[in-house]
């Protein structure tokens, strides 16, 4: 049966060899929060980055990319204007 | 090409929580270390606890939830693909998920 002092020495030596922190009496420190790996960047990049046509045209300063949703909207708007159901004109001051 | 506008509004909240968490993570971890260290005086620990509680509510990691990256659905999301059940099925049948094939025996 090894004595308590020898076990303590073994603990100290083991901590020195393996590069871990020496801990006596099973005391708890908050060390795990400091050692913990930061995961904010990984969590932030969960959703894939996307871009829409308006941003693309603004970025490239170009008009050649057709925006089908916008074209459809303009088509619907012209149809409504033809039927006399377009948006009302804004008041002039 | 799709914009992020196709997601549910709760997915935008999740996106906000992720950004805020990444922004305040270092401050949070350091204050947690101080608060959870019993060797420090109690006043110092309680002040660290106050600083943690003073962080914005959406900066806490418990607010983060993995939602579908296609639709923003919160349940039935496969972790490996980040997709809910139905978008997963659509992509799998269209042969767009590597390593996934329809069962046939």
Curated annotation (Swiss-Prot), chain A:
Pfam families: MRP-S33. The keyword Acetylation does not apply. It comes from the Eukaryota. Its main location: mitochondrion. One of its GO terms (cellular component) is mitochondrial small ribosomal subunit. It is found in: Mitochondrion. Disulfide bonds: none annotated. Keywords: Mitochondrion, Ribonucleoprotein, Ribosomal protein. One of its GO terms (biological process) is mitochondrial translation. GO terms for molecular function: structural constituent of ribosome. InterPro entries: Ribosomal_mS33. Component of the mitochondrial ribosome (mitoribosome), a dedicated translation machinery responsible for the synthesis of mitochondrial genome-encoded proteins, including at least some of the essential transmembrane subunits of the mitochondrial respiratory chain. The mitoribosomes are attached to the mitochondrial inner membrane and translation products are cotranslationally integrated into the membrane. Belongs to the mitochondrion-specific ribosomal protein mS33 family. Component of the mitochondrial small ribosomal subunit (mt-SSU). Mature yeast 74S mitochondrial ribosomes consist of a small (37S) and a large (54S) subunit. The 37S small subunit contains a 15S ribosomal RNA (15S mt-rRNA) and at least 32 different proteins. The 54S large subunit contains a 21S rRNA (21S mt-rRNA) and at least 45 different proteins. This is Small ribosomal subunit protein mS33. It comes from Schizosaccharomyces pombe (strain 972 / ATCC 24843).
Swiss-Prot record, chain B:
Its main location: mitochondrion. One of its GO terms (cellular component) is mitochondrion. The keyword Transmembrane helix does not apply. The keyword Isomerase does not apply. Pfam families: Ribosomal_S14. GO terms for biological process: mitochondrial translation; translation. It is found in: Mitochondrion. One of its GO terms (molecular function) is structural constituent of ribosome. InterPro entries: Ribosomal_uS14. Keywords: Mitochondrion, Ribonucleoprotein, Ribosomal protein. It comes from the Eukaryota. Component of the mitochondrial ribosome (mitoribosome), a dedicated translation machinery responsible for the synthesis of mitochondrial genome-encoded proteins, including at least some of the essential transmembrane subunits of the mitochondrial respiratory chain. The mitoribosomes are attached to the mitochondrial inner membrane and translation products are cotranslationally integrated into the membrane. Component of the mitochondrial small ribosomal subunit (mt-SSU). Mature yeast 74S mitochondrial ribosomes consist of a small (37S) and a large (54S) subunit. The 37S small subunit contains a 15S ribosomal RNA (15S mt-rRNA) and at least 32 different proteins. The 54S large subunit contains a 21S rRNA (21S mt-rRNA) and at least 45 different proteins. Belongs to the universal ribosomal protein uS14 family. PANTHER family: 30S RIBOSOMAL PROTEIN S14, SMALL RIBOSOMAL SUBUNIT PROTEIN US14M. This is Small ribosomal subunit protein uS14m.
């Amino acid at each position: 049966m090894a004595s308590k002092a020898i076990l303590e020495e073994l603990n100290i030596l083991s901590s020195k060899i393996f590069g871990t922190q020496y801990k006596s009496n099973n005391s708890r420190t908050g060390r795990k929060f400091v050692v913990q790996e930061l995961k904010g960047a990984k969590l932030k990049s969960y959703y894939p980055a996307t871009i829409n046509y308006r941003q693309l045209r603004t970025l490239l300063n170009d008009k050649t990319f057709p925006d089908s949703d916008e074209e459809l909207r303009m088509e619907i708007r012209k149809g409504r204007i033809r039927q006399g159901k377009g948006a009302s004109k804004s008041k002039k001051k | 090409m799709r914009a992020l506008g196709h997601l549910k509004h709760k997915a935008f909240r999740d996106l906000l929580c992720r950004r805020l968490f990444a922004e305040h993570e270092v401050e949070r971890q350091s204050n947690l270390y101080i608060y959870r260290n019993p060797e420090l005086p109690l006043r110092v620990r309680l002040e660290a606890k106050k600083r943690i509680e003073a962080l914005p509510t959406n900066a806490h990691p418990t607010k983060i939830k993995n939602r579908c990256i296609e639709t923003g659905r919160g349940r039935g999301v496969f972790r490996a693909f980040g997709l809910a059940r139905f978008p997963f099925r659509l992509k799998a049948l269209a042969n767009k998920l590597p390593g996934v094939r329809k069962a046939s025996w």
